[in-house]
Regions:
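Extreme N-terminal leader/targeting segments of oxidoreductases
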Residues: 1-26, 44-45, 49-50, 233
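Rossmann-like flavin
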Residues: 85-192
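Glycine-rich Rossmann-fold phosphate-binding loop(s) that bind the pyrophosphate
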Residues: 30-34, 56
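Glycine-rich FAD pyrophosphate-binding loop
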Residues: 44-66
Length: 492
């Protein structure tokens, strides 16, 4: 079964696994958006660098190929979250985010990347009465800062997209969000990176990093036989389950199989996001949270007329446990979100990719929004892990004496924010005096997650409190207010 609709029917490009010992200026672990953008931005800045990308499965296998294709300008998961954490920088971060989205779109056009880009803007809808007044306040405050949001009352929102439950909406333009096919973008980035001289090795699992004089030794094994959705340490060892992230780290560190490849690199970039459990130094910074998605059959002309949606905007609702939805290039509806499921021990693996109870819940919620589409089939359904920090923003750092740089924790914003983060990673390696590295946003680290079993208890307790707030007109209980007060921002 395909990891996502975007990958269905696709045969991933086969790039050889790494065998033997090589040297590189920079080794990048991870062939998703963060890894590919970092490779490109480094190569553009210093064409003489030898850069290698080491990907465990294939380019776009992880979150980069399983998301909804929403490419947003935000770096901080909303103005309110940015103000909570970085009040003195939030205006600049918003400008940087919009500049980044503009530059990303220009890059797509300049390099001829065909990724079904749709610059249609984003529409947020209210399905609860209390949200209508909040929308008025949101639009008033944002437009006073120079934004160009448009408030839509019930009649106006129904004219855009027909649903009996939506009471108001806020429209933002394509400078806030665009839609695209993330797998096509990934493949386009891989092509550009290769044209710039970057070497990409797929089916190459990184199992350890070792500090050596003037660099880091990266040890890899050939994982090409595990390049379908069932890959994993558990499968390789013949176990009936995938170990937790901690277990994977312990197994990896104890793995005495001969390395199929080694890279002696001046710098290493860890760009594995939710799959970063292999590098234990990052264990407290993030949790992998599973998000689930449905994609429908193509709409008939009559079904399309029944829902409207002529503007083809990206859409989401405004609940804590929110849904996101969109039309695909072939006129299917993608509907995802709501459940955000954490598995104990930073659990990650193919056994979590399909969750029937969540798919049933999503389908029922879809029919509540679009009862006129009863009977519409959903042939594609999948899940994937999102790397989440306690601040709901990407975090940066360096280990091994500055030789290893990481960026992770996008919390759903990685399609767009990964390009900006790649610029920060480039500056860590090439431009230590960069203004970006002086941002508190870049220098600070989020509040760490506690170890197990407290981690599971805390994450799942917060999920229940968010659900309670949604059922209580958005009013946050004592726990959520306390977390807000100490700068720990949680959402779905």
């Amino acid at each position: 079964m395909s990891p996502s609709y975007w990958l269905a029917g696709e045969t991933p490009a086969s790039r050889p696994a790494l065998h033997g010992a090589i040297r590189a200026d920079v080794a990048i672990v991870g062939g998703g958006f963060t890894g590919l953008w970092t490779a490109i931005r480094l190569a553009e800045s210093e064409p003489a660098l030898r850069i290698v990308v080491l990907e465990q499965a294939f380019v776009g296998f992880g979150a980069s190929g399983r998301n909804g294709g929403f490419c947003e300008a935000s770096l901080v998961h909303g103005r309110a979250n940015g103000e909570r954490h970085f009040p003195s920088e939030v205006d600049r971060l918003e400008r940087l985010g919009r500049d980044n989205l503009r530059e990303l779109i220009a890059f797509i056009h300049d390099h001829g990347i065909e990724c079904d880009l749709e610059e249609t803007g984003v529409l947020t809808v209210a399905d609860e009465a209390h949200q209508v007044a909040e929308f008025h306040e949101w639009v008033t405050e944002a437009n006073a800062r120079g934004d160009r949001l448009v408030f839509l009352d019930r009649a106006a929102i129904q004219a855009e997209v027909h649903s009996p439950i939506w009471q108001a909406g806020v429209m933002a333009g394509p400078d806030d969000a665009v839609l695209l096919d993330p797998v096509k973008l990934c493949r386009g980035l891989a092509r550009v990176a290769t044209d710039l001289g970057v070497e990409i090795h797929e089916g190459t699992r990184t199992v350890s990093l070792e500090r050596i004089p003037r660099g880091v030794r990266v040890r890899t094994v050939d994982s090409s036989a595990e390049r379908d959705e069932s890959f994993g340490i558990g499968r390789r060892l013949g176990l009936p389950f995938e170990p937790s992230a901690l277990g994977q780290a312990l197994i990896g560190s104890a793995d005495d199989r001969p390395a199929s490849g080694t890279v002696q690199a001046g710098h290493v970039v860890v760009a594995t996001s939710a799959y970063s459990g292999w590098y234990p130094r990052l264990a407290g910074l993030f949790v992998p949270v599973y998000d689930y998605v449905l994609v429908s059959d193509p709409l008939t002309a009559a079904q399309h007329e029944a829902v409207g949606w002529a503007g083809r905007q990206a859409m989401s609702d405004a609940n804590n446990q929110f849904h996101y939805f969109r039309l695909t290039a072939d006129d299917r509806i993608l509907w995802g979100g709501y459940d955000a499921v954490y598995h104990s021990g930073n659990g990650i693996g193919p056994r979590y990719d399909h969750r029937p109870e969540t798919f049933e819940r999503l389908e029922a919620q879809f029919l509540r929004a679009f009862p006129q589409l009863a009977g519409l089939g959903f042939p594609y359904r999948w899940g994937g892990a999102i790397d989440t920090t306690s601040s709901f923003m990407v975090t940066f750092g360096q280990t091994m004496g500055g030789r290893v740089t990481h960026a992770l924790g996008y919390t759903g914003l990685g399609v767009g924010a990964s390009r900006w983060a790649a610029g920060v990673v480039r500056d860590f390696i090439l431009r230590p005096d960069s203004e970006l590295l002086g941002l508190e946003f870049v220098r600070s680290s989020p509040f760490p997650f506690p170890p197990e079993p407290l981690r599971s208890v805390a994450v799942n307790l917060v999920r229940r409190e968010l659900d309670r707030a949604d059922r209580n007109e958005g009013r946050r209980g004592l726990l959520l207010r306390a977390l807000d007060a100490v700068g720990i921002g949680f959402d779905s």
